Swiss-Prot record:
Coiled-coil spans in chain: none
Superkingdom, natural source: Eukaryota
Native organism: Gallus gallus
Protein name from the UniProt record: 3-hydroxyisobutyryl-CoA hydrolase, mitochondrial
Pathway listed: Amino-acid degradation; L-valine degradation
Encoding gene (name): HIBCH
Amino acid sequence: MAARVLMAPRRLKPFNRLQVILQHLKTCKHTDSAADVLLQKQGGAGIITLNRPKVLNALSFKMIQQIYPQIKAWEQDPETFLIIIKGTGEKAFCAGGDVRAIADAGKAGDTMTRDYFREEYRLDNAIGTCKKPYVALIDGITMGGGVGLSVHGHFRVATEKTVFAMPETAIGLFPDVGGGYFLPRLSGKIGHLLALTGFRLKGRDVLKAGIATHFVESGKLPELEKDLIALKSPSKENIADLLNSYHMQTKIDQEKEFVLDEHMERINSIFSANSMEEIVQKLKQDGSPFATKQLEAINKMSPTSLKLTLRQLREGATMSLQDVFTMEYRLSQACMRGHDFYEGVRAVLIDKDQSPRWKPAALEEVSDEFVDNCFKPLGNNDLKL
C-alpha cells in the first residue's frame, strides 16, 4: 500500500507534463503563417504578430477575439515574463481598426457595431492593466486601433519608419482606443493638435512627443527581439535596461529638433480655447503657415466629430483609463447611430473621392444638446470591463 502511494506521483508526472504541453498548444494555437494574428511562446516571452500585411495589419474583430484571451492567459502564466507585439511586413505595425467592416455591419444592422468597439476597448484595457511587461514594436504606420494596441503598454519602441496619427475625425469618428486618456496627458496641447487635425508624427518625433518610450533603428528590431526573448526571468527593470541600451546606441536624427518645438507656444494658446469655433477663429487670426495648414485640415473634418473630440479630451483629462473607455464606448455608439461615420468611410475608403458631405456641414450647426446626448449613459448597454 505504501509503495502504491509512493509510486502514484511518479505515474502522474508524465500525465501532468502532457497536460502542460496540451495547454501550451491550446494557448498558442494561432501559429499558422496564414492566420491574421500569430500567437507564440518563445522562451519566457509571449509574442503577438499582427499578420495582415496586405491591409497594413488592420485590426479585425477576429484578431481582437484571439488576442484578448491570450494576453489574459499569459498574464496568469508563471512561465511568461513579458509580452511582445509586432506587425508583419515593412510598412505597418497596425494602420487601425477594420472600419470598413464596421461600416458595412452598421448598414446591415449587424451587432458588430456594438461588439467590435466593446471587445476592442476590453482588449486595450487589458493591455493598460497587464501585470506582465508589455513591449510594442511600433515599426511603420501606427494609427487608430494600432495605437490602442501599443500606447497603453509599458514600453513602446518607435523606429525611423514609425508614422503615428489619430486621423479619426476625417472619417466621422473620434480618436478612441483610450485617446481620451493619453492625448490630454501629452505635453501642453500636443494631444489636442493630434486629435483634431490628424497631424502625423514621424520617426524620433513619436518619442519626443511622449508617445514612444524608446527609439531603435528598424533594422535592429530582430536583434532586440532576440535579446528580449533570451532574458532569463526578467523584471520590468531588466527589460527597461535592455531597451535603454539599444535606445542609447541609436543615432538616427539624434540632433534633430522636435517638429513641434517652434510651434509649441502657438499650439498651447490656440488649442486651449473653450470651443471648436474659438479654435478655428484663433487659427484664422494667427495666420502663420503652420496655423493655416492646421485650419485647412480642420476644415476637412466632420464638424460633429470635432465637437465630440474636444469634449472627449476635456472630460478624459481627469478620468481613469477605465472611465475613458466607458465614455468612448458611448461615443462610438452615438457615431454608429449617426450619418458622418458612414459618409466618411465612403469618401475615404470606398469611393475614395475625399469629398465627404458632412451632416451637419458646419460647426455652428452641431448643438451642445446633441453633443450632451452622445455622452449619456447607455444603461444596460454600457461598456462593462
